[in-house]
Amino acid sequence: MKNPPALTRRHLLALAAAGLAAPALPAGAQGAGAWRRVPEIAGLLDGVEPKEGGIALDLPFVSENGNSVPLSVAVEGTGVRALHIFAPANPSPQVATFHFTPLSPAAVETRIRLNESQTVVALALLDDGTALIAEREVRVTVSGCLTDAGTYASDSLFQTRVRVPETLAAGAAGPVLTMIGHPMETGLRPGPDGAPLPQRLIERFEASLDGEPVFAADLYRSVSADPYLKFQIAPQASGTLALTWREDTGHVTDAEARIVVG
């Protein structure tokens, strides 16, 4: 199978010029090097020194509250084994891990929870054993979102939405947008009796085209309620896109969409 269209440096620079992406914080900038203080990142690197550059990481500079902060990230080139997102100042630093295939260029958007102002980190692990790192500082006006009841509101439990391009040229990438109604209960919010409410999370998302893996995501406590994902698909032929959302209780929700290549 052909590799997906590579995200080139030109593409990343174009995103940055449009205000849709930002490079890693320069050495000496406030918050720079935040990743070195995250044990989970050190464990993933296993002694490899990551390189700055090659990742376009975009979040707002200021968020009025941390309940739902938009995040987009794209990695230059191909051969991305996994893309990890961390919010080091959250109670659980790991936010999400994204997995790409030859059918999906390494670009994704979602919404995350930030419990306070901090530097968000993106770590890309590549097939050749190297790693890329990027950081973005975000100021949160109202902190403590992970214990705010409004963080968990969801009126449409397990209801899904999917949007795909009408048609795609063979091998050309196009966006898939999907979401599911779910409170993403973290286990940190106190209930009426003061005891923490039980954790209840959508922990895994998978997309496949006629049975062939396209894209997957591991989701953790810091993904916003009603999880939203926008990823890319670059099919060679028409087929049925199958989407699966898996809750940590074992409950599974499925959805489908037709991908037309012509």
Please provide the spans of the model-predicted regions.
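Short beta-strand edge segments in extracellular beta-sheet folds
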Residues: 137-143, 258-262
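Short amphipathic, basic-aromatic surface patches that mediate peripheral association
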Residues: 180-196
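N-terminal secretory signal peptides and thylakoid transit peptides that target proteins
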Residues: 2-19
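C-terminal segment of N-terminal export signals and the immediately downstream linker at the start
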Residues: 24-53, 160
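Short acidic/polar inter-strand loop motif in beta-rich domains
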Residues: 127-133, 247-254
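Aromatic sugar-binding surface patches on proteins
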Residues: 103-108, 222-230
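Structural beta-strand segments of beta-rich domains
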Residues: 67-71, 172-176
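N-terminal edge beta-strand
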Residues: 45-64, 154-169
